[in-house]
């Protein structure tokens, strides 16, 4: 499930030195007043931004409740922030996460869905994989009979470089189980995600 399991711990000292070298490489003076603390600040920011590399996101789904609930659970408009692994610039937007509990009726706390998305997002990432990882975790840990995850995000690698199209939104979806196999159920959950 999580292909980042063997990642080494964050090396803040090494990251600070690397940022200092990057400033030199782009033609800046890392010893000028405005940049003196920048390497350490950026290293601390990256430590937080990539914290998901050092966590197993599926652990947030270990606490469940046997509610006997057999219908859709959907949380919409969950803000997400991640870093494009190709350019190491942010992408950000919203995730919509829905599932129908399995036969056991196990549900998780609503905040756990947002936490799951955050933990998978806090690593070098691509939106397509992020979407699938969230869906697969719900199937694996909750034994959900149907899962739908939709992410809508703006990628700064498209907005501030290359094609330069700010405001362009990329939408990805991952459907599992009943939502994948039943067109009517899939259409219903996508309609609810759109808010109609």
From Swiss-Prot:
Family that this chain belongs to: Belongs to the GTP cyclohydrolase I family.
GO MF terms, alphabetically ordered: GTP binding; GTP cyclohydrolase I activity; zinc ion binding
Catalyzed reaction equations: GTP + H2O = 7,8-dihydroneopterin 3'-triphosphate + formate + H(+)
Residues at which Zn(2+) binds: 84, 87, 157
Pathway note: Cofactor biosynthesis; 7,8-dihydroneopterin triphosphate biosynthesis; 7,8-dihydroneopterin triphosphate from GTP: step 1/1
Source organism phylogeny: Bacteria, Bacillati, Actinomycetota, Actinomycetes, Mycobacteriales
Protein name from the UniProt record: GTP cyclohydrolase 1
GO terms for biological process, alphabetical: one-carbon metabolic process; tetrahydrobiopterin biosynthetic process; tetrahydrofolate biosynthetic process
Pfam family, one: GTP_cyclohydroI
Top-level taxonomic group: Bacteria
Gene this chain is encoded by: folE
Enzyme class, UniProt record, top EC level: hydrolase
Subunit structure as annotated in this protein's UniProt entry: Toroid-shaped homodecamer, composed of two pentamers of five dimers.
Keyword annotations of the record: GTP-binding, Hydrolase, Metal-binding, Nucleotide-binding, One-carbon metabolism, Zinc
InterPro entries assigned: GTP-CH-I_C/QueF, GTP-CH-I_N, GTP_CycHdrlase_I, GTP_CycHdrlase_I_CS, GTP_CycHdrlase_I_dom
CC per GO annotation: cytoplasm
EC number: 3.5.4.16
């Amino acid at each position: 499930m999580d292909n980042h399991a063997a990642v080494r711990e964050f090396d803040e000292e090494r990251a600070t030195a690397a940022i200092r070298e990057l400033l030199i490489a782009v033609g800046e003076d890392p010893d000028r007043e405005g940049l003196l603390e920048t390497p350490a600040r950026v290293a601390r920011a990256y430590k937080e931004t990539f914290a998901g590399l050092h966590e197993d996101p599926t652990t947030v789904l270990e606490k469940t409740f046997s509610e006997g609930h057999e219908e859709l659970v959907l949380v919409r408009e969950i803000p997400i922030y991640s870093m494009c692994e190709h350019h190491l610039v942010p992408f950000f937007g919203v995730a919509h996460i829905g599932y129908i509990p399995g036969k056991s009726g196990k549900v998780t706390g609503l905040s756990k869905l947002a936490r799951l998305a955050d933990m998978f997002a806090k690593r070098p990432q691509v939106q397509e994989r992020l979407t699938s990882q969230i869906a697969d975790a719900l199937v694996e840990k909750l034994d959900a009979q149907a899962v739908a995850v939709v992410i809508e995000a703006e990628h700064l690698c498209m907005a501030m470089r290359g094609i330069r199209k700010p405001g362009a939104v990329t939408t990805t979806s991952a459907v599992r189980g009943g939502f994948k196999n039943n067109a009517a159920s899939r259409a219903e959950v996508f309609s609810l995600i759109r808010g109609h």
